[in-house]
């Protein structure tokens, strides 16, 4: 049995199958640290976690880390929970307010702004979500995670970033991947792999363990929008994102 393992996982609906699997895998005794994606990466960097689900954009900067498992948080087409929302068509957007809970999504919107939408907006940090209720002409908001569900239908224009990436590159997208500290035993790697497999194979049961069970969209989202398999095409997509997407970083105006 793999014991005393500290695992940082994302506290969003998209990670519920992973969390369920980790909690129910008999050969894995782990301490779970749940947080938004950016904090999962920080927990790994600070040595608080041995294994972590981290934004794909940060992996090249992690020291002493290696990619593990055949699983990820990915999408083939629309992901639904990483969306640029606006009452202005994207070609006329002047300001983009960024949700910094995931470095990957921030990098991705920067890549799409330059290469797909051909715009050069002012980039601003979104800390006050009441700004969404006071949107001005030319404003757009990058929203990430479960909060997107609360704002669906509020804006006239919604640009799903995974869908926009696929139109641009003809590839799926990888938002988050599993990493581990180099040197962890085979038993740990195997136990984590088995745990994630169990969770992905029991999505319905995983939802019953959570408040999301009563939400009609939850099962559809996890089975139709999120693609958990880190397959060959997603490896290709991740390499392309690392080669090109990371070169375009939105320069945020501090205000």
What are these regions (language model features)?
Residues 2-11, 30-33, 94-97:
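Short, well-ordered beta-strand elements
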Residues 103-127, 179-225, 229:
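Ligand-binding clefts/hinges and TM-proximal coupling segments of bilobed small-molecule sensing domains
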Residues 148, 208-255:
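An extracytoplasmic/periplasmic, membrane-proximal ligand-sensing/linker region
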Residues 21, 81-90, 95, 173-187:
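A bilobed periplasmic-binding-protein/Venus flytrap-type ligand-binding module shared by bacterial periplasmic
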Residues 71-130, 165-166:
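A conserved helix-loop-strand patch within extracytoplasmic ligand-binding domains
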Residues 31-42, 120-137:
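Short helix-initiation/N-cap motifs at beta->coil->alpha
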Residues 125-208:
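Pocket-lining segment of extracytoplasmic ligand-binding domains
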Residues 12-14, 36-38, 48-60, 71, ...:
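Beta->alpha turn/N-cap motifs
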